[in-house]
Amino acid sequence: MSKVTEAFSNGKAFIPFLTAGDPNIEKTENYILELEKAGADLIEIGIPFSDPIAEGVVIQEADLRSLKAGTTTDKIFNMVASVRKKTDIPLVFMTYLNPVFHYGYETFFTKCEEVGINGIIIPDMPYEEKGELNDIARSHQVDVISLIAPTSEQRIQKIAADAEGFIYLVSSMGVTGVRSEIKT
């Protein structure tokens, strides 16, 4: 059983999200440790990206602040390595395919394994295109978290059957952010 799956041992999990490097990388490390103290079962760490198409204004602005502060993927890996000296809480990256592709799949997931990243969520990677990346991630003990958006029953069953770690349910169409209601 993976560390990500273990986070759901009580049937549900508290999973907060934060953008790495907002306002700076040192505070991100402190925030992760404080989130664990506050009861987090797993923490999503957003790797900032210049074009976060699935994100609403709050996370877009956090990404821009982080990038402006000089946050890089290497600095995030170093921060995670430091966090790992203090906690073993499951950590999952939330990022887009471009930064992972640019880093190189093998190099990226080797580094994830070295520093102790347990999973990854890539919202702009279609299920049908995750084959090569998924195989490399699995070889480095990194769960690729599947997303399920409103779709056909057959597609939901297919994605769910192949899921690892947990399933990220996209509850509404559009970008992330505050909603006055969620229509299902």
What are these regions (language model features)?
Residues 14-28, 92-104, 143-151, 179:
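Active-site mouth loops of central-metabolism enzymes
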Residues 39, 112-118, 138-144, 161-168:
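Glycine-enriched alpha-helix->loop->beta-strand junction motifs that scaffold or abut catalytic
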Residues 68-71, 116-129, 143-151, 157, ...:
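Catalytic beta/alpha-barrel core
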Residues 16, 35, 46, 112, ...:
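Conserved, mostly hydrophobic/aromatic
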Residues 42-43, 47-49, 58-122:
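Active-site beta->alpha loop and helix N-cap motifs at the rims of alpha/beta catalytic domains
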Residues 15, 41-44, 121, 146, ...:
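Conserved beta-strand positions in the central sheet of alpha/beta enzyme cores
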Residues 1-17, 81-84:
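N-terminal amphipathic alpha-helix/helix-capping segment at the start of soluble metabolic enzymes
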